[in-house]
Amino acid sequence: MTRRACLGAGLLTLLAALCSGPATAAENWGQRAGGKPWVVYYADKEPVEAFEGFRLLVLDSETHPPLRPLSERGKVLLGYLSVGEVESHRPWYAKVKRWGILKDENPNWKGSYYVDLRDPRWISLVVEELVPMLLRRGFDGVFLDTLDNPVYLEQAQPQKYKGMTEAAAQLVRAIRRNYPAIPIMMNRAYPLLPRVERDIDFELGESVYADYDFKTKSYKLVDQPLYQEQLKLLKDAQKRRPELRVMTLDYWSPADPDGIRRIYKEQRANGFDPYVATIDLDRIVKEPPP
């Protein structure tokens, strides 16, 4: 795994990366892994053989199947990394809490706290410790989650969180600058796309067409206005950068194979690479046969 030799140079290296222009990935990971079945799985119960039909795997950074046999089978492995929030069960939570840069608890996810991306210590931790940790474990690259949060916080309280959106973009650029050869997938964070779409290989549209309603505890189609809005944002990104692979993660009940087929058909017609899962992401849901 190729990395920049300057990784250990500390904040000076990071600041230089933040001020630099985009560093496009050295390898076309989208071409290598895109257009093929892929999966998101945040557990460790499934045997290696269960992943046989998939090329790209997004796995939890700590709870996951053995990585070496998956890599030996040619799988592209992305490790989950929440960079807009810190969960209380993560090993680095106590350190970040001591720094005083944790904000409110996410009302939808108990024990997960928004983090102030404007603090250079957070960027340093992600780039110099967390990403290398994933690569040492055997992941090829990273799946960046919760980058919607800094955008949301700045929109909701522009004075208090001024600069959070740009800080999120700078974090993505810093990862790419320090790791030019690894695959990077970003989850949603659509307003960041014009700033970072040349620094990532995959953009994930989560809950674009189908979602889970936690109040009714049921799966449902996304309202048409929201679906069309997301569709436009993703297609616009594809037009600006054709090399960018757009993946979709929709949620539906495995007890309704016809519904799952409908989602796959819809997203492929959109030009995206779909996967349909249960909301817990703790089991592999194979695409139903035609």
Q: What role is predicted for each listed range?
A:
Residues 1-2, 14:
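Disordered, low-complexity tails and leader-like regions
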Residues 21-25:
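Sec/Tat signal peptide C-region and signal peptidase I cleavage site
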Residues 3-7:
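N-terminal export leaders
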Residues 9-18:
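Bacterial N-terminal signal peptides
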Residues 26-290:
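Glycan-processing catalytic domains of CAZymes
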